From Swiss-Prot:
It is found in: Cell inner membrane. Belongs to the KdpA family. This is Potassium-transporting ATPase potassium-binding subunit. Signal peptide: none annotated. Its main location: membrane. One of its GO terms (cellular component) is plasma membrane. Part of the high-affinity ATP-driven potassium transport (or Kdp) system, which catalyzes the hydrolysis of ATP coupled with the electrogenic transport of potassium into the cytoplasm. This subunit binds the periplasmic potassium ions and delivers the ions to the membrane domain of KdpB through an intramembrane tunnel. The gene is kdpA. One of its GO terms (molecular function) is P-type potassium transmembrane transporter activity. It is a multi-pass membrane protein. The system is composed of three essential subunits: KdpA, KdpB and KdpC. It comes from Leptospira interrogans serogroup Icterohaemorrhagiae serovar Lai (strain 56601). The chain crosses the membrane at residues 6-26, 59-79, 127-147, 172-192, 247-267, 278-298, 363-383, 410-430, 475-495, 520-540.
Length: 557
């Protein structure tokens, strides 16, 4: 037990120390003088890096770029059998699965209704999925940069930056070098990286077993750093070829949260308010720690169904309950979705924490860039409510918060919630949806709720007892992913454009609400809990909470 506490403290301490350092590195990347290679890329792509955009042009560029990324990935998956690097001769994906997968990776969700080792070729995994892992992560970073600039400038609607320049810099100077270095570490610790086809082996029982191989380490590196989460293998990081040792497990857990944590301090440096960044980071860090302790406690508790201590089903013995608990919380507070254990087999309360983390709109660390710009929506709402309470015009970092900013903030907060609840309600009423359940009762409801929470929250993890590879779920979850991603990005860019055309006051008035102290910390945490968590309390009571109490009557589903 002492060893586990030491490991947990090392993990949290490392996150606390390295997040501001990585944030400083990100800040310097976007201040860095344009290199010769970068100029060459701008020239061949016809990009003018000195031309700034307003929010409409920035949004249009982002949408067009992501659409063509989706379209290219869809074609790669659909026509997979005609493309190279397919030693297993896998056929192309059917249209609905190809559509779902292309949307999934283009929106940084990485929801997988298939097992990669038995469905996708090397080319599809590398040129298709891995490429989108880079681009979707950088897209989130671009939106955060635009919002940060909108807050930090005065009277300049064309000061949000250049989307194409931001995209190239984020990919070229941040994700590519970090992923390359991390992939080398992973290979050194035993993660597979090869173009060899599957190996046939004879087991101790005398049966033949097919052992799939592939370029795994290169995909794992970016899937974790980019908060993507989609695994090369169907069981994701539970597979020994993706995650062979406690060291690789620790490094991957750390890599899930480091860039989202760094984005908090990137935002603080661009807006000139590091103390405000620390206040936001403190809220995120608190929710992370509380989540880990709750999950660890309940997963280690007495299991009335099996009559043993601990909920061990679905967990790797080599990682244990603590590492499974840390990973579950880390992957759900971030929009990562990778797993080293099966969330469907967690205790009801352990599973509840994962669902709730996603339903908080992935703002506790969240995706690269996406978590921070999602958190700012809650920050703006907090500032507005505090201003109303004291009878002052709300201000945020020297800029007045008015009707347009609050409307867009509420839209960005409520749209994913509406999608989750509406699509879940539809699915429990449709026979095609219910036929995919392998579990009934409250756990069956939790599986459907988790699926749409994961889709709309752009997380990608699942309660895998739900057979999601059907036309109904492939299409419905794809729609949820699109609305959950761009239904937040567009309001954020509108806010960026609106704030950019306002004057930023450097003088803090006597009645202004401080966004740096303990009062702000408590209010922001309260708004997140009230607006974020209580929205889903009714449905959670008839899902995992009900299942928790039924479990003590020795009933399971």
């Amino acid at each position: 037990m002492v060893t586990e506490w030491i490991q947990l403290l090392i993990f949290l301490f490392a996150l606390l120390i390295f997040s501001p350092l990585f944030g400083l590195g990100l800040y310097k990347v976007y201040l860095y003088k344009t290199s010769g290679f970068e100029k060459f890329l701008y020239k061949i792509c016809g990009i003018d890096p000195n031309r700034n955009m307003d929010w409409k042009e920035y949004a249009l560029s982002l949408l067009v770029f992501n659409f063509f990324g989706f379209l290219l990935l869809f074609l790669i998956l659909f026509f997979q059998n005609y493309l190279p690097l397919n030693p297993e001769n896998f056929p192309g994906l059917v249209w609905d699965l190809a559509f779902n997968t292309a949307v999934s990776f283009a929106t940084n969700t990485n929801w997988q209704a298939y097992s990669g080792e038995s469905t996708l070729s090397f080319f599809s995994q590398m040129a298709g999925l891995t490429t989108q892992n880079f681009l979707s992560a950088t897209t989130g970073l671009c939106v955060l940069l635009a919002l940060s600039r909108g807050i930090s400038v005065n009277y300049n609607v064309f000061a949000l930056g250049n989307f194409w320049k931001d995209m190239i810099r984020g990919t070229l100077y941040v994700l590519l070098p970090l992923s390359f270095i991390f992939a080398l570490f992973l290979v050194g610790f035993g993660v597979v990286q090869t173009f060899s086809e599957s190996v046939s082996a004879i087991t101790l029982e005398g049966n033949t077993q097919i052992i799939p191989l592939g370029p795994v380490a290169s995909q794992v590196a970016i899937k974790q750093l980019g908060t993507n989460g989609g695994g090369y293998f169907g069981v994701n990081a539970s597979h020994p070829f993706e995650n062979p040792s406690p060291i690789s497990n620790f490094l991957q857990m750390f890599s899930i949260l480091i860039l989202p944590g760094a984005c908090v301090f990137l935002y603080g440096r661009i807006t000139g308010s590091i103390r405000h960044a620390w206040a936001i980071f403190s809220v995120m860090f608190t929710i992370l720690c509380v989540g880990i302790l709750i999950v660890w406690t309940f997963e280690s508790s007495w299991n009335p169904i099996s009559g043993t201590l601990g909920f061990w089903e679905g967990k790797e013995i080599r990682f244990g309950i603590l590492n499974s608990s840390i990973w579950e919380v880390a992957t759900t507070v971030a929009s990562n979705g990778s797993v080293n254990s099966m969330h469907d087999s967690f205790s009801p309360i352990g599973g509840l924490v994962g669902i709730l983390n996603i339903q908080l709109r992935e703002i506790v660390f969240g995706g690269v860039g996406a978590g921070m710009y999602g958190m700012i929506l809650f920050v703006l709402l907090t500032v507005f409510l505090s201003g109303i309470m004291v009878g002052r015009s709300p201000e945020y970092l020297g800029k007045k918060i008015e009707k347009r900013e609050i409307q867009m903030s509420i839209l960005g907060i409520l749209l994913p919630s509406t999608i989750i609840l509406l699509f879940t309600a539809i699915s429990v009423s449709v026979s095609d949806a219910l036929s995919s359940l392998t579990n009934r009762g409250p756990h069956g409801l939790s599986e459907i709720l988790y699926a749409f929470s994961s889709g709309a929250g752009n997380n990608g993890s699942a309660f895998a007892g739900l057979n999601a590879n059907t036309t109904y779920y492939n299409v419905m979850i794809a729609i949820a992913m699109i609305l959950g991603r761009f239904g937040v990005i567009l309001p954020v860019l509108v806010i960026a454009g609106s704030l950019a055309q306002k004057k930023r006051s450097e003088i803090v008035s006597e009645g202004s609400f401080s966004t740096e102290g303990g009062t702000f910390y408590i209010l922001l945490l309260s708004v997140i809990i009230i607006v974020g968590a209580l929205t889903f309390f009714p449905v959670l009571t008839i899902g995992p909470i009900l299942e928790h109490f039924i479990m003590f009557q020795n009933l399971t589903f």
